[in-house]
Amino acid sequence: MTEQDAQELHEYKVLIDRYIDAGDGQRIEIAAEIERRFSVETTILVLDISGFTRLTSKFGIVHYLSMIRRMQLLTTSIITDHQGEIIKFEADNLFAHFPDVDAAIGFSLDVLQRFRSMNVSTNDHSDIHASIGIASGSVLVLEHRDAWGSTMNLASKLGEDLAEKDEVLVHEDAFSASRKKSFYATERLELMASGISIPARKIRG
């Protein structure tokens, strides 16, 4: 953790502790201060490796951990080529943010293509397939290592729960900001999650 990250974390803890102890009126002001200090407008990407249950039950957890490590090495090596920054790796997921939706889509298509190339030289049970979700909006970011907010939740829902393997799902609001719409072959979908309709674009990698 850098000195700046440590200072930001300390300032956040001071504010959130004040929020806990404050009355309703003060809480509104403190919440606004936290959002002003730590919120950023960004594009969130969540990548999830497909096949956890099947692969671990058949080949064991160490085999699956080796696949996670290969995913981490690949994505780390190319994310800056697409102006992205890794927020964190968690289990078999990658959480990252990008300056705009086109950068996130570009990374998605690149990484899925690289997985396909890697899979040519591996056995089927070692092949890596991933599902990816993308959403844009305001998020709270701390230490450059974690993020919270509805945009983060939406990207996670798209990437972990709704996208199929080798598929990219981009929330419609994020896709509408793309400057390269005509370059992508997409299918518009109306998805449902927890009783909520989620308009999205499906992009095949």
Regions found by a protein language model. Give the residues of each.
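Alpha-helical scaffold within the catalytic cores of cyclic-nucleotide enzymes
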Residues: 5-12, 66-83, 94-132, 136-138, ...
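Catalytic NTP-binding/metal-coordinating core of nucleotidyl cyclase/transferase enzymes
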Residues: 8, 19, 27-106
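A generic structural signal for short hydrophobic patches within well-formed alpha-helices
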Residues: 52, 104, 139, 174-178
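A secondary-structure boundary/capping signal
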Residues: 90, 135-136, 170-171
